[in-house]
A protein has these predicted regions:
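Aromatic-capped interface at the extracytoplasmic side
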Residues: 1-8
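Soluble "head" domains of membrane/secretory-pathway proteins
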Residues: 10-149
Length: 149
């Protein structure tokens, strides 16, 4: 699979080449997955943040994402999140805390590059049947060869 775009930066870079697995695979929180998005008309790569029954809270004021009250930490996320509209322009709103109750049988996904990612904050929940597989190995560039996490 070819990574196209910056939405998973710093974890994955544009033009990285990955191997995915899909045999007997069920998406889990923290996994990096390849998704066939009908809403976007393309394949996207995102991290699973929540699964069915989870409550995901995206708090732009405190720069946090929580799942069931527990803050998700990721060392690859280096910049503060800002809220955007559909045209990727920054804007201010009174309420900068958004709560998502993930329905059973659905996934909530986000790009690691939170400020440049079209993900569940916009396209909402993902059906696990749209997940093509989990990214497990980076093949290229050769100097970044190794396990994807």
């Amino acid at each position: 699979v070819l990574v196209q775009g910056p939405s998973m930066r710093e974890t994955l870079q544009d033009q990285d080449r990955l191997i995915i697995t899909h045999i007997n695979y069920t998406p889990q929180k923290g996994d990096i997955v390849v998704i066939n998005s009908e809403k976007l008309g393309k394949t996207i790569i995102k991290r699973v943040i929540g699964t069915g029954g989870d409550k995901v809270v995206v708090d732009y004021n405190n720069n946090t994402v929580t799942v069931n009250g527990k803050v998700i930490s990721n060392d690859n996320i280096r910049e503060a999140m800002y809220n955007t509209n559909l045209f990727d322009e920054k804007y201010e709103v009174e309420e900068n805390v958004f709560e998502y109750d993930v329905p059973e049988g659905k996934l909530f996904v986000m790009g690691d590059n939170r400020n440049n990612s079209t993900d569940s904050r916009r396209i909402v929940f993902i059906d696990p049947s749209d997940v093509l597989g989990k990214a497990v190995l980076r093949l290229y560039p050769f100097d970044s060869f190794g396990k994807v996490s």
